[in-house]
Every structure is written in C-alpha cells, then in structure tokens.
Amino acid sequence: MTLYTPKQLADSMRVVRKNTIAIAEDIPEAQYDYRPTQGSRSVRETLLHMASMTLFDLHIHEEQKRTSMDGFDFREFFAGLPTNEKNSLPKSVIVAVLRDGGERWCDWVEKLPEAQAAEFVTRGGAGPGDKSRFEMLIGSKEHEIHHRAQLMVIQRLLGIVPHLTRNRQRPQESAKESTT
C-alpha cells in the first residue's frame, strides 16, 4: 500500500520552498547577517543551510545512489558547496539558489521511481538504523520546515509580520470592513 508518492512529496515540497522563498524575499538584505543569539545561525547562514540540503539529497540519492552513509564525510561535502553557509552570497543569489535548487530537487523527486524511493540506506555513523530514501527525503522537507519556523521567529524579532500571517489576516480585515 502506498500512502504518499514521490509526486505528492514533490508537490508539498514546492509549497514549502515557495514559503521559504517568500521569507527570504521579505527580510531586507541589510538584515541577512542578523542572528538572534550569539552562536546561532544568521538569516543568511540559515537560508544557505536550507539550500544546501537539496544539493545533499541530489548528491547522495541521485548522483552517487549510495546504499550506505559509511565513510561519507559530511563536513567536507558541505564545506565544498557553493551554498556553504559561511559564504557571503548576496540576497539575490540566495533567492535564486533556493528557487532553482528547490525546483531541481522537486523535478527529480517527482520522477523518482517508487522502487528506488523504497530502497534502504544504511546510516552507519550518521545515526542508528536504516532509512528508506523516501523517509530521508521527507526528513529534508521537515528539516526545511524546522528552519523556516526559526526564520519566522527572526522575522518577528525584526518587526516583520510573516507572509503567512499577513495572508491569514487579510480575509479577516476584509470581513471586518464589510460589516462596518
């Protein structure tokens, strides 16, 4: 029984990434180096970190088709990416990378054969137990949602009302105006 297909995952990730891009666009570039606490990621670092995950998935599951994470050097991989979170890429480039990388990831996941999605990857030193490729890809979507929530809190700290809240408030404001 299939409960959730690669196409459905790609469709839902498109919504997640669209909302991430809206946040990236809403935050002024002058605030991209803001970090809410010492030792936390800045807005720029968080967005680059999120963009890196789609590259990670494509590398692991499409290019290398790894069946085991044993011997994979996570630090080296992420340090070598153009989206390394320590790079000072401008806002326009970050938004473009989020848009293009997200769509590339979604296009690939959408066409992923279910048999390949069901393959298990031994996690080795990356964590206990094996996971299917599909579970790992869902984990990437959850990971982005987690960091997007952090960015929404940062928006509030910067005095920005997140777009999802603004969108929800508009119909309520229109209803109030029509009754007065």
Question: Which role fits each region the language model picked out?
Answer:
Residues M1-Q8, S52-G129, L158-T180:
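Short, helix-capping/interhelical loops that line the mouth of catalytic, cofactor-
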Residues Y4, D11, T37-E45, S88-S92, ...:
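Residues at secondary-structure transition points
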Residues M13-T20, V43-L58, V95-W105, V109, ...:
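Alpha-helical transition-metal enzyme core signature, strongest for iron centers
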